[in-house]
Regions:
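Conserved catalytic residues of ABC-type ATPase nucleotide-binding domains
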Residues: 1-73, 80-84, 90-91
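Repeated loop/turn-to-beta-strand initiation elements of outer-membrane beta-barrel proteins
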Residues: 70-73, 128-130, 187-192, 227-231
């Protein structure tokens, strides 16, 4: 007759779950190396931040190249309409221009410009479907049409006079671009982006060599042409 054990049962040997103990391997998400964007931005322009008139606008395209997981270089072409008012003391036309013989009180302007920006972007925060970024760069301005209205006194009476110029001066690397923004992937190769910005003059632009500043917000629809980079999330 077999004897039954009378002592306490032997402790069970715990078997480690190899799946649970294995270290988590980060998964990679694809990031577009080359993207194209359609852009629109309302903006306000001012000379020395003294006054504002009606808003202007920017419409254009941008090509963006990601050369590192958090770094991108972009170039674009924008058709820009800038409206501003300047004091006569901030408007400096060529020496022989007629306004130099009068005391100009104010100049109102509407300028149609080709803006060629070159910007460097850094992603401050990256998530699976979104990114927060900051950007810095420079713009070259090509003056296509400049329309001016001058206000001054003639023999004690207020006078307004208009004048326009087509295909005026070009100003290379004349604007400093600063911006920050938020990008979100919609699905597939599409993304949207919102980007508040300021443009700070590095020199005078236009016929009157005014120090023109602008502020606004770009809204962009982006499409990935070359999705080839991956980063861990």
């Amino acid at each position: 007759m077999a004897l039954l054990p009378t002592g306490p049962p032997a402790p069970a040997i715990a078997v480690a779950d190899s799946a649970a103990a294995a270290p988590r391997v980060p998964t990679a998400r694809p990031l577009a190396r080359l993207t194209v964007a359609l852009q629109y931005a309302p903006e306000l322009s001012t000379v020395r931040w003294a006054s504002y008139t009606a808003p202007g606008s920017n419409v254009g395209v941008q090509l963006e190249y990601r050369f590192a997981p958090k770094w991108r270089l972009s170039a674009g072409v924008l058709r820009s309409v800038k409206r501003y008012a300047a004091r006569g003391t901030d408007y400096h036309p060529p020496t022989q221009y007629w306004t130099n013989y009068y005391t100009i009180d104010e100049v109102e302007a509407t300028c149609r410009i080709t803006d060629i920006p070159l910007n460097l972007r850094y992603d401050v925060l990256q998530r699976a479907r979104a990114a927060v970024f900051a950007s810095v760069g420079v713009s070259s301005l090509l003056m296509r049409q400049e329309d001016y209205r001058y206000y001054y006194l003639y023999k004690g009476n207020p006078v307004a006079r208009s004048w326009g110029l087509r295909r005026g001066s070009n100003h290379l690397l004349s604007i400093l671009n600063l911006s920050a923004g938020y990008e979100r992937t919609l699905g597939g190769r599409w993304a949207v982006q919102a980007e508040p910005f300021v443009k700070i003059p590095l020199g005078g632009v236009g016929f009157g060599k005014v120090k023109l500043s602008s502020a606004g917000a770009f809204l962009s629809l982006k499409y990935a042409l070359w999705p080839a980079v991956a980063v861990a999330r």
